[in-house]
Amino acid sequence: MASYKKERLENDIIRLINRTVIHEIYNETVKTGHVTHVKLSDDLLHVTVYLDCYNREQIDRVVGAFNQAKGVFSRVLAHNLYLAKAVQIHFVKDKAIDNAMRIESIINSLKKSKPN
């Protein structure tokens, strides 16, 4: 499959999930989360949705709430994406921000310990 088609589908999935959170989900915990990026498998059967939220302490609750509403998201994706089979959605915590903060703290500690 062409990579541009897969990239277009990933962008459509982000758009559909965000629209569903705004218009169809009434759980406030879900509304605090947002999709950072999406990874679609090569066979178009599995999609990994990376989530983040403003309050980092609640990220596990947000991922759990998204998993509870997985049926709504599956229905929306099945109706709006023209694929042979419905995709299986996997919601996971986006660790990119945590990793960036950890690297920044290491760099700052190295700068402080380095004599000038």
UniProtKB/Swiss-Prot annotation:
NCBIfam families: rbfA (TIGR00082)
Single GO BP term: maturation of SSU-rRNA
Gene3D superfamilies in the record: 3.30.300.20
Origin species: Mycoplasma pneumoniae (strain ATCC 29342 / M129 / Subtype 1) (Mycoplasmoides pneumoniae)
GO molecular function annotation: ribosomal small subunit binding
Keywords attached to this entry: Cytoplasm, Ribosome biogenesis
Family the UniProt entry places it in: Belongs to the RbfA family.
Entry's transmembrane regions: none
Quaternary context: Monomer. Binds 30S ribosomal subunits, but not 50S ribosomal subunits or 70S ribosomes.
Pfam family, one: RBFA
Keyword Cytoplasm tagged: yes
SUPFAM superfamilies (alphabetical): Ribosome-binding factor A, RbfA
Function: One of several proteins that assist in the late maturation steps of the functional core of the 30S ribosomal subunit. Associates with free 30S ribosomal subunits (but not with 30S subunits that are part of 70S ribosomes or polysomes). Required for efficient processing of 16S rRNA. May interact with the 5'-terminal helix region of 16S rRNA.
Protein name (Swiss-Prot/TrEMBL): Ribosome-binding factor A
Disulfide bond in keyword set: no
Cystine residue pairs: none
Source superkingdom: Bacteria
One Gene Ontology cellular component: cytosol
Cellular localization per UniProt: Cytoplasm
Primary location class: cytoplasm
